[in-house]
């Protein structure tokens, strides 16, 4: 296609919309990163960046973090709420709380906290949902506002640690998830001589729509019913501790795509707040939880992978609803808290790796079957003649369907011994030739052709074998059908010659990416430049900064990848600040209680038994290097 342009590539991969300006495609067809949208000219090619890392000794795959994106996401969300507060004359402020479960990596949490260094009044706190997370935030929250929100189920130790946080100078809100926690908090607070800051997680009747909708609604795993909330109020009153109740919390679920769901949830929770205030509770914080979505596919829709609103609309709806409710009930406006971890972290990380090989269909010439060949093969030859233009007596779709029926029959006949292996091979090649010809004759403009086009794109797609583990690096793609943008990092200045699917290197048929952003929709294959064994072919998996690292598993003992922190300096040049080596083979063996030291002893015994003396040292050295090596492919 001579009329192909970079704009075609940008729209074809929908980069403009899912990237939020952080990623783009340069005129030379290279994918770029621009971590500070305020300096849009500061763009660095990811292909060049990856090559420089490889030259510096960093093996692929590598997870590349751009901390400036984290800073920008914090600032943009706070700015959206600050603007909404001014717009509606809201009489309180906003606090962004980062739930570290989204990404607990030290560099990520520290960079999010570092976004507050220049702030006179920090607008950032931290959230913990377990004892290990609580221990982490107790040591880090002082770098921002020192506000800590404690969610999740709690035992006595968790509660005591949270209360000790108050002694350390933090403001620790212990959010009650179930009735039994209240008694434990009051007992341990008295023992420690601390007045607790309590929060209530209310269980809303309203349930938003999405993959995580079970987080809300009456059957939610977490939260207190209306009756339980009133019981907590009564118990606090009888203990003369009602003033300790300072926060109301609810959570509709992660990735809420429809702004109306958010508005409705805030409205219901807001009435809880106002009525509890009327009952004498001193609640002054309104925690909307998570739910702020990320537009993974860039369609700006209500799909599970998208969102039909922007940051300003999100903030405006929350502030507007609360303003109206507080005015209606004549109650003070509470501090607004949101726990928007996915929004902060998703864009900041990209997994870059290499294609190690492909399996591609190439049309081969077929010869007319012999006169004594099975009639089925003659039927298939006739279909081939018709579709190849030598005859034109039937509709394209009819010929295609007949060919599919014929190949199915061929497989059945082979299975019962009525078709030879050579005949089966001929039938398969004839079917592929028909499919190839049919695809070239179909039109996207004909709606009757579109289902067949989709079917053929999948059937004829190249298989790209990619040096990564889906289960380790993109577990949500496997577990919940999450869509992540995937792009070749170069060659996009030319029209894509092929369509492909990405397969990982695990020994598992589920190790395949089966959904791709393609224009304004999702497809089962990805348009790509053709692969060549003569030059490196790099692939980027984008928006993997939220949840993927901590959820990733070690299927086939593929471990953590290498990771790097990269900044773009004031000159627009990339600076690799740090590299964290991924797991070695010995590391992952240790994880499953296999000892590399014991293995070396065993290897030595076997070498002494079976290898001639002059080869023993080199064999042992290779075995030792194998234990010290990267779990991913390095030589291919």
Swiss-Prot record:
Reactions it catalyzes: L-arginine + H(+) = agmatine + CO2
Alphabetical keyword list: Decarboxylase, Lyase, Magnesium, Metal-binding, Polyamine biosynthesis, Pyridoxal phosphate, Spermidine biosynthesis
Protein residues bound to substrate: 286-296
Cofactor(s) recorded in Swiss-Prot or TrEMBL: Mg(2+); pyridoxal 5'-phosphate
Positions of post-translational N6-(pyridoxal phosphate)lysine modification: 101
Pathway in which the depicted protein is active: Amine and polyamine biosynthesis; agmatine biosynthesis; agmatine from L-arginine: step 1/1
EC number: 4.1.1.19
GO molecular function, one term: arginine decarboxylase activity
UniProt keyword Cytoplasm present: no
InterPro entries: Ala_racemase/Decarboxylase_C (IPR009006), Arg_decarb_HB (IPR040634), Arg_decarbox_C (IPR041128), Arg_decrbxlase (IPR002985), De-COase2_N (IPR022644), Orn/DAP/Arg_de-COase (IPR000183), PLP-binding_barrel (IPR029066)
GO biological process: arginine catabolic process; putrescine biosynthetic process from arginine; spermidine biosynthetic process
Highest taxon of the lineage: Bacteria
Signal peptide (residue range): none
Homology family: Belongs to the Orn/Lys/Arg decarboxylase class-II family. SpeA subfamily.
Function text: Catalyzes the biosynthesis of agmatine from arginine.
Protein name: Biosynthetic arginine decarboxylase
Source species of the chain: Shewanella frigidimarina (strain NCIMB 400)
């Amino acid at each position: 296609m001579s009329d192909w342009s970079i704009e075609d590539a940008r729209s074809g991969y929908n980069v403009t919309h899912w990237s939020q300006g952080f990623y783009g495609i340069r005129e030379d067809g290279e994918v770029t990163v621009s971590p500070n949208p305020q300096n849009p000219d500061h763009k660095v090619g990811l292909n060049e960046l990856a090559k420089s890392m490889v030259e510096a000794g960093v093996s692929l795959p590598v997870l590349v973090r751009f901390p400036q994106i984290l800073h920008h996401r914090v600032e943009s969300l706070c700015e959206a709420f600050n603007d909404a507060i001014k717009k509606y004359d809201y009489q309180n402020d906003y606090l962004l709380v980062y739930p570290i479960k989204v990404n607990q990596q030290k560099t990520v949490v520290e960079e999010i906290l570092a976004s507050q260094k220049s702030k006179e009044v920090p607008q950032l706190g931290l959230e913990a949902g377990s004892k290990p997370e609580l221990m982490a935030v107790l040591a880090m929250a002082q770098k921002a506002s020192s506000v800590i929100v404690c969610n999740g189920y709690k035992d006595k130790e968790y509660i005591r640690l949270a209360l000790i946080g108050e002694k350390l100078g933090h403001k620790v809100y212990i959010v009650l998830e179930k009735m039994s926690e209240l008694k434990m908090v009051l007992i341990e607070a008295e023992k420690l001589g601390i007045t607790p800051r309590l929060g209530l997680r209310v269980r809303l009747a309203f349930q938003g729509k999405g993959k995580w909708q079970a987080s809300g609604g009456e059957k939610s795993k977490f939260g207190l019913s209306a009756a339980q909330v009133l019981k907590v109020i009564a118990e606090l009153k009888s203990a003369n501790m009602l003033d300790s109740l300072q926060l109301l919390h609810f959570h509709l679920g992660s990735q809420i795509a429809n702004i109306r769901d958010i508005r409705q949830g805030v409205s219901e929770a807001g009435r809880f707040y106002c009525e509890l205030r009327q009952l004498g509770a001193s609640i002054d914080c309104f925690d909307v939880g998570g739910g702020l979505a990320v537009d993974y596919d860039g369609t700006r829709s209500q799909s599970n992978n998208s969102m039909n609103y922007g940051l300003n609309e999100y903030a405006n709806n929350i502030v507007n609803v609360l303003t109206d409710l507080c005015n209606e009930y004549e109650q003070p406006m509470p501090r607004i808290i949101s726990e928007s971890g996915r929004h902060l972290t998703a864009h900041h990380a990209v997994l870059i790796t290499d294609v190690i090989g492909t399996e591609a269909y190439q049309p081969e010439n077929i010869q007319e079957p012999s006169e004594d060949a099975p009639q089925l093969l003659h039927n298939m030859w006739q279909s081939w003649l018709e579709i190849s233009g030598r005859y034109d007596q039937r509709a394209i779709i009819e010929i295609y369907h007949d060919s599919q029926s014929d190949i199915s029959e061929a497989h059945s006949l082979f299975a019962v011994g009525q078709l030879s292996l050579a005949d089966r091979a001929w039938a398969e090649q004839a079917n592929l030739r028909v499919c190839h010809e049919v695809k070239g004759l179909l039109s996207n403009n004909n709606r009757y052709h579109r289902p067949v086009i989709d079917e053929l794109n999948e059937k004829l797609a190249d298989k790209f074998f990619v040096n990564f583990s889906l289960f380790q690096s993109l577990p949500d793609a496997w577990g919940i059908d999450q869509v992540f943008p995937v792009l070749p990092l170069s060659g996009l200045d030319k029209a894509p010659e092929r369509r492909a699917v990405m397969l990982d290197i695990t020994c598992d048929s589920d190790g395949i990416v089966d959904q791709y952003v393609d224009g304004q929709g999702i497809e089962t294959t990805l348009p790509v430049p053709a692969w060549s064994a003569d030059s490196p072919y790099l692939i980027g998996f984008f928006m993997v900064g939220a949840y993927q690292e901590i959820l990733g598993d070690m299927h086939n003992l593929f471990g953590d990848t290498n990771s790097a922190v990269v900044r773009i300096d004031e000159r627009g040049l990339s600076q690799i600040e740090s590299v964290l080596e991924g797991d070695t083979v010995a590391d992952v063996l240790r994880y499953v209680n296999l000892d590399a030291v014991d293995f070396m002893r065993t290897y030595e015994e076997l070498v002494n038994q079976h290898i001639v003396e002059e080869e023993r040292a080199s064999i042992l050295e290779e075995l030792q290097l194998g234990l010290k090596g990267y779990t991913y492919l390095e030589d291919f």
